[in-house]
């Protein structure tokens, strides 16, 4: 089972991007599950999501505690301790940022880090700060799913 955790902010399309991944994997014959986690907060508040992909029925229904893939839609969330909590060794980490990897002050965990200026791409193409589509492209490339 592949487990993916999303960290973003309300309005960035975190939930929609996870729904698109689940729909895509289900249509390809796999099983997918997405559990969003957010409150009644307004746009800009932290949003989390937990996604699973497997070849068989997914019976577990809880948060993803040990992700193999981490999608971070806002680099200001890198400072939150729970962002990297439980990260599997050699996990894939995709970060929406304009900074290079050395500037991010990432924890000393063995991981494969990919950065993309998804916000810049979104602003250039749709003139809105909704980076989910560019993040989906980075996800597809980095994970080869």
Q: Language-model features: where?
A:
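Active-site cofactor/cluster-binding pocket
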Residues: 1-145
